[in-house]
Amino acid sequence: MYVVVLSLGDPVSRTFLELVPEMPLVETRGEIEVRKFGEWPAVVHKGEPTDFNREDLLLSLGKYAIFISRHEMANPRPMFTVHTPGSWPDVSVANPPLATAIFRALCRHAEEPFKCAFEATHHPPNTSAASATFVEVGSTEAEWRDRRAVGVLVQALEEVLGRELGAGATTMVVGDLHYSTVADSALNGEVELGHILPKYLETTLQHVKTAFYKHTTPVRRVVVFRKNVKNPARAEVVEFLREREVEVVLKG
């Protein structure tokens, strides 16, 4: 089951709560409220999305967590983003069908000037059993409090959580830009995107192994950007993947 995580320290979560007033309280666990978003449980806590570390609570409610959050960037522009969290060298469990379905829905419903992007794996929390997907609105206070923009996010969630998810090839990406350059393959239904290891990570085989084993669906394809993953690490990564009969796509 899905579980939505809303953080009172986050302006997008607060706008979400304003837009969806009918979220009946189910129970209180300490300072954390468990409410209902449609037919799905929603956790409301006082901190920031990246501070939430109650995986035990998530697992008691569902296996697939969706964190509602603001997005920030150095050169702000209106944007919807989706990504799996992870503060390397560890990461959360990625849910490629869910993350990619939400990404497609956001892109489908986004109105100018909003764009959409699939981001590389970054920032906490790190989960071990429950999957974690961040869904974000950016990139300034104006967008975080834009009820129409956050309404698109709500619409995308309601649409995705109420249907079967895609069945494209689960794909991991190694050495990509922070804003993934292979997102079009997800939009057209060819792949379901999982962990994206950014080029600034200085990827090692251990990074790849950690990410590879933390997906809800088996990784079938890995895109490796050659110029951003230097040997001997690149050769080790390719060997590891091919030994597991994973399709390796070398780019760049």
Curated annotation (Swiss-Prot):
How and how many cofactors are bound, per the record note?
Answer: Binds 2 Zn(2+) ions per subunit.
Q: Does the keyword Cell membrane apply?
A: no
Q: Which UniProt keywords apply?
A: Hydrolase, Metal-binding, Zinc
| EC nos | 3.1.1.96
Catalyzes what?
Answer: a D-aminoacyl-tRNA + H2O = a tRNA + a D-alpha-amino acid + H(+); glycyl-tRNA(Ala) + H2O = tRNA(Ala) + glycine + H(+)
Database matches in Pfam families: tRNA_deacylase (PF04414)
Q: Name one GO molecular function term.
A: D-aminoacyl-tRNA deacylase activity
Q: Which InterPro entries match?
A: Deacylase_DtdA_archaea (IPR018033), DtdA (IPR007508)
Please name the PANTHER family in this protein's record.
D-AMINOACYL-TRNA DEACYLASE
Kindly state the subunit structure of this protein. Answer: Monomer.
Name of protein: D-aminoacyl-tRNA deacylase
Q: Can you name the source organism? A: Pyrobaculum neutrophilum (strain DSM 2338 / JCM 9278 / NBRC 100436 / V24Sta) (Thermoproteus neutrophilus)
